[in-house]
Curated annotation (Swiss-Prot):
Official protein name in the record: 3-phenylpropionate/cinnamic acid dioxygenase subunit beta
InterPro entries: 3PPDioc_HcaF (IPR054881), HcaF (IPR023712), NTF2-like_dom_sf (IPR032710), Rng_hydr_dOase-bsu (IPR000391)
NCBIfam families attached to this UniProt entry: 3PPDioc_HcaF (NF042947), PRK10069.1 (NF007479)
Pfam families for the chain: Ring_hydroxyl_B
Signal peptide (residue range): none
GO BP terms: 3-phenylpropionate catabolic process
Family the UniProt entry places it in: Belongs to the bacterial ring-hydroxylating dioxygenase beta subunit family.
Catalytic function, reaction form: 3-phenylpropanoate + NADH + O2 + H(+) = 3-(cis-5,6-dihydroxycyclohexa-1,3-dien-1-yl)propanoate + NAD(+); (E)-cinnamate + NADH + O2 + H(+) = (2E)-3-(cis-5,6-dihydroxycyclohexa-1,3-dien-1-yl)prop-2-enoate + NAD(+)
Enzyme class: oxidoreductase
Gene name in the database record: hcaF
Catalytic activity, EC: 1.14.12.19
Length: 172
């Protein structure tokens, strides 16, 4: 990462991320989509456990995409959720997106900032189904001319190597 940002800029970007999390928790998916850049890259790969000796050699086991979405694909996912016919979200999940350890730095691209946050996503559904997703997100945010923000990239890294939930229909 490059140079760290000022406290004021850190606060503004953090507030953008907190607002984005509340939109997801409140099922305001269309408002959330409006926070995304047209060029959004929204990705998550499987997590694979590597032996220490392999990591020291720089060997990483192959992974598979869980998500590798564009804005159009995210819009289709949300349209499906809005139909009320998405079985994975009947009844709808109740979520809480918690983010912490927010580290923000400049990039080589003007008005684009790299953000690393740890997250905990709690999901409750039906009476007894509960799931915790924990990991790190690597985001890039773009500052617009009107001083608003857009999410340009989100790379989601799960700590869990085995996903025990019934599905991954929630947004991170």
């Amino acid at each position: 990462m490059s140079a760290q940002v000022s406290l004021e800029l850190h606060h503004r970007i953090s507030q953008f991320l907190f607002h984005e999390a509340s939109l997801l928790d409140d099922w305001k998916f269309r408002d959330w989509l409006a926070q995304l850049d047209e060029e959004i890259r929204y990705t998550m790969r499987t997590t694979v456990n590597a032996q220490t000796r392999d990591r020291r050699k720089g060997v990483q086991p192959p992974t598979t995409w869980i998500f590798n979405d564009t804005k159009d694909q995210l819009e289709r996912r949300i349209a499906r959720l809005e139909t009320g016919m998405a079985w994975a979200e009947e009844p709808p999940s109740r979520t809480r997106h918690l983010i912490s350890n927010c580290q923000i730095s400049e990039t080589d691209i003007p008005n684009v900032f790299a953000v690393r946050v740890n997250y905990l996503l709690y999901r409750a559904q039906k009476e007894r189904d509960e799931t915790f997703y924990v990991g790190t997100r690597f985001d890039k945010v773009r500052r617009l001319e009107d001083d608003n923000w857009r999410l340009l990239e989100r790379d989601i890294v799960l700590d869990q190597a085995v996903i025990t939930s019934h599905n991954l229909s929630v947004l991170f």
